Curated annotation (Swiss-Prot):
Presence of the UniProt keyword Transferase in the record: no
The protein's name in its UniProt record: 4-hydroxy-3-methylbut-2-enyl diphosphate reductase
Pfam families, per the entry: LYTB
Key words of the record: 4Fe-4S, Iron, Iron-sulfur, Isoprene biosynthesis, Metal-binding, Oxidoreductase
Annotated isopentenyl diphosphate binding sites: 36, 70, 120, 214-216, 258
Catalytic activity: isopentenyl diphosphate + 2 oxidized [2Fe-2S]-[ferredoxin] + H2O = (2E)-4-hydroxy-3-methylbut-2-enyl diphosphate + 2 reduced [2Fe-2S]-[ferredoxin] + 2 H(+); dimethylallyl diphosphate + 2 oxidized [2Fe-2S]-[ferredoxin] + H2O = (2E)-4-hydroxy-3-methylbut-2-enyl diphosphate + 2 reduced [2Fe-2S]-[ferredoxin] + 2 H(+)
Cofactor(s) this protein cannot do without: [4Fe-4S] cluster
């Protein structure tokens, strides 16, 4: 069986930047998980004593607080600034962008339609910057019962699928007088999605590596599953099962934006050992 990596996969700019910040901030604490990958979170804790707090209320005698890649709410930032703690901002610049857009557009009288998961920390953070109504949706059908205003600005969670975003935009363009569209899906997300789409259309088994709570990894898995029914989402090599690869000729591999290279390599090594023993 041949193993092929997607043309674009793994760590994105924002995650690489955040990891470097954390490694240079020994003994700091992150407000929430720095990234959605438990294995990398454990490595940072073990090697750099970077701890994870659930929220700001858990801050006690910590000297340094790191803001996670997904950002923080406007109120949370004000709370942090009121404390005697050094603030280290690891928010991805691509997440800061929709925060700024939402703050500006709402101040100009636009209500916000936000394509995203309402419980995701990135979405909570961006929402908090709006002074107007924010409609957080995953599907355009959720707007059918909403009395839409005459002015709307549309943004997306950075890790969502572009196809769905364009459907939502199209729906609004047909019903709202003035629609301002901001494509805030980041380039790394688009490139990884396009690469997994291409590979899964050829492979007869796909392995997507990443945190189960990672939005961008989940999107890669859904794209892959649609084109290659034998697609599997795993966090580490320990989840691989030999039966997935029996009688398969091409195994495609992709990984989420918060999946470190060492985890990906462990999966490839285990996969090669598994299939070698079986041959």
């Amino acid at each position: 069986m041949k193993i092929e990596l997607a043309k674009s996969y793994g760590f994105c700019f924002g995650v690489k930047r955040a990891i470097k910040i954390a490694e240079n901030s020994k003994n700091a604490s992150t407000i929430g998980e720095l990234i959605h990958n438990s294995l990398e979170i454990d490595r940072l804790k073990n090697n750099f004593n970077v701890k994870t707090l659930k929220d700001i209320s858990e801050l006690k005698n910590e000297k340094k607080a790191i803001i996670r890649t997904h950002g923080i709410t406007k109120e949370g930032l004000a709370n942090l600034k009121s404390r005697d703690v050094e603030i280290i901002d690891a928010t991805c610049p691509f997440v800061t962008k929709p925060q700024q857009i939402v703050e500006k557009m709402s101040s100009e009288g636009y209500e916000i339609v936000f394509f995203g998961d309402i419980n995701h920390p990135e979405v909570k953070g961006v929402m908090s910057y709006s002074s107007k109504n924010v409609y957080v949706i995953l599907d355009e059908s959720e707007l059918e019962t909403v009395k839409l205003p005459s002015k709307i600005a549309v943004v997306s969670q950075t890790t969502k699928k572009i196809e769905k975003f364009t459907k939502i935009v199209s729906y609004l363009m047909q019903r709202v007088k003035e629609v301002r569209v901001f494509n805030t899906i980041c380039n790394a997300t688009l490139e990884n999605q396009e690469a997994v789409r291409e590979l899964s259309s050829r492979a007869d088994v796909m392995v997507i590596i990443g945190g189960k709570n990672s939005s961008n990894t989940k999107q890669l898995y859904l794209i892959s599953k649609n084109l290659c029914p034998d697609s599997y989402l795993i966090e580490s090599e320990n989840e691989l099962e030999l039966k997935w690869f029996q009688n398969k000729k091409l195994c495609g591999i992709s990984a989420g934006a918060s999946t470190p290279e060492w985890v990906i390599q462990n999966v490839i090594n285990k996969l090669e050992n598994l299939t070698h023993k079986d041959s």
